[in-house]
């Protein structure tokens, strides 16, 4: 039985992954299943699939991993389908909040799934309530689908344009009616969305590995501000705004941590970007050591880059238990320590007596770095110098990532030297913002969002959401 979890590891969390297909020669429910399975890393709380055969639409949803929700695949026939995996950044982790959501419009049923986070949800929700709408979830996704369902515009493309006039924030959306499938990406391009081609149909997905999972070919990224419509006539593209109308806000954390290393996103190979981050770390801070190790799995590729640049051998020092159950973890230091020990265990022969350069991708709350360092010390490490392949996280994200309130972010309150002392490392270095931008070499720095590091948000965010450092207690 799936239970809501208190996330015990010190990482930010992506909100979700989306997938959709239009193909008369394939079973949509099977292809969507494989697609969202390939996106499981983007959300583990719930999963859902909507399928239509052109006449009847049906949605199947549940709490848990894709394999838990769909132990037996539905027998629903259909050539159009969308799917979703979720980690909740807005809305509670309850069955009502599982996506896709389905609604009735004047043109018939529609279903929608969303990756991202709106910054004007409350205002839109109030306005819809005044117009007589009722809500059964606490998600911004329900606001989106109700705005679409209420639209009186004559075409779906015009309905999406009207929607994009209303909503602000991050969104990569897939939707379907009984006749077509749609996708759109916000004008800043915060969240990823790609277009793929099967032999006889078309696919939309958050990341390219979902295309690989069903043997679809990558065609291109959906552009920021683009609306795509897919039906029996093929693919049509409509731009809500010119792609160069303003600077974009592509999320840098996709490249640091969220995306699968085998993804290609906005023209950038994720694996290469992470190798570059490791090499940049060595350029900025040439720690001496006997071995380079990673905190698995998120630090693996950057550690390989650091080892290659430095000439210090890379060895596995921490073994990750890939079969650990999704157990509810109560807050508290002892239980947090137990959770980390369940997940990671030192390989003593590679640790004992060694001067270790340890590579991880980020420190957010600072709750587990000290536990990991203590594990290595207890296994006999002589020295532990920690390198982080991103800058200090000092500001919250409002665009689809759960990075906690500002008062919970350790780097917002303490200096690097203080954090180093608190976690028990012998030295600590964060990758510079410039080094990070140079590592993501296929995208211009001005087209990326680094707000969680520098506090410069691409668009207006609620003032009270920035958090006061005065109310730390």
Protein language model features and the residues they cover:
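A conserved beta-strand->alpha-helix junction
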Residues: 137, 142, 314-325, 422-440
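Secondary-structure transition/capping motifs at alpha-helix termini
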Residues: 133, 154, 284-290, 308-315, ...
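Short, glycine/charge-rich flexible loops or terminal/linker lids adjacent to PRPP-binding catalytic cores
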Residues: 311-357, 367, 394-401
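PRPP-dependent phosphoribosyltransferase catalytic core
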Residues: 164, 179-180, 215-221, 374-473
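Phosphate/diphosphate-binding loops
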Residues: 162, 210, 217, 225-226, ...
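Generic beta-strand/beta-sheet core signal
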Residues: 113, 176, 184-185, 196, ...
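Conserved short alpha-helical segments that host acidic/polar catalytic motifs at enzyme active sites
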Residues: 1-224, 229-289, 295, 383
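Flexible loop/turn segments at secondary-structure boundaries
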Residues: 28, 89-90, 120, 190-191, ...
């Amino acid at each position: 039985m799936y239970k809501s979890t208190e996330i015990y590891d010190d990482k930010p969390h992506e909100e979700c992954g989306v997938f959709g297909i239009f193909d008369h020669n394939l079973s949509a429910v099977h292809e969507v299943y494989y697609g969202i399975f390939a996106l499981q890393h983007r959300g583990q709380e719930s999963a859902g699939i909507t399928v239509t055969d052109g006449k009847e639409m049906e949605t199947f949803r549940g709490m848990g991993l894709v394999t838990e929700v769909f132990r037996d695949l539905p027998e629903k026939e259909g050539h159009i389908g969308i799917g979703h995996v979720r980690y909740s950044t807005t809305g509670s982790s309850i069955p009502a909040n599982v996506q896709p959501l389905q609604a009735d419009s004047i043109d018939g049923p529609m279903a929608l799934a969303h990756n991202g986070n709106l910054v004007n949800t409350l205002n839109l929700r109030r306005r819809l309530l005044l117009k007589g709408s009722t809500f059964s979830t606490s998600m911004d996704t329900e606001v989106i689908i109700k705005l679409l369902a209420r639209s009186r515009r004559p075409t779906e493309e015009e309905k999406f344009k009207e929607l994009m006039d209303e909503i602000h924030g991050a969104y990569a959306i897939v939707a379907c009616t009984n006749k077509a499938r749609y996708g759109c990406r916000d004008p800043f391009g915060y969240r990823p969305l790609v277009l793929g081609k099967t032999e006889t149909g078309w696919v939309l997905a958050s990341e390219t590995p979902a295309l690989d999972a069903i043997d679809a070919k990558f065609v291109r990224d959906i552009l920021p501000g683009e609306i795509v419509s897919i039906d029996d006539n093929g693919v049509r593209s409509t731009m809500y705004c010119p792609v160069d109308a303003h600077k974009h806000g592509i999320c840098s954390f996709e490249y640091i941590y969220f995306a699968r290393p085998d993804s290609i996103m906005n023209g950038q190979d994720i694996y290469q970007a992470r190798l570059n981050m490791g090499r940049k770390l060595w350029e900025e801070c040439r720690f001496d050591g006997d071995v380079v190790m990673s905190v698995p799995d998120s630090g693996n590729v950057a550690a390989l880059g650091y080892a290659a640049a430095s000439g210090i051998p890379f060895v596995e020092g921490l073994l990750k238990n890939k079969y650990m159950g999704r157990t509810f973890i109560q807050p508290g230091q002892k239980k947090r320590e137990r959770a980390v020990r369940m997940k990671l265990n030192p390989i003593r022969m590679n640790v004992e007596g060694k001067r270790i350069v340890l590579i991880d991708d980020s420190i957010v709350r600072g709750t587990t770095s000290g536990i990991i360092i203590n594990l290595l010390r207890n296994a006999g490490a002589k020295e532990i110098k920690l390198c982080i392949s991103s800058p200090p996280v000092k500001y919250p994200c409002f665009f689809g990532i759960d990075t906690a309130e500002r008062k919970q972010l350790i780097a917002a309150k303490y200096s690097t030297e203080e954090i180093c002392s608190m976690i028990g490392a012998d030295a600590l270095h964060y990758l510079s913002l410039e080094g990070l931008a140079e590592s993501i070499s296929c995208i211009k720095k001005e087209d990326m969002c680094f707000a969680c590091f520098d506090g410069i948000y691409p668009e207006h965010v609620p003032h009270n959401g920035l958090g006061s450092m005065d109310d730390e207690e």
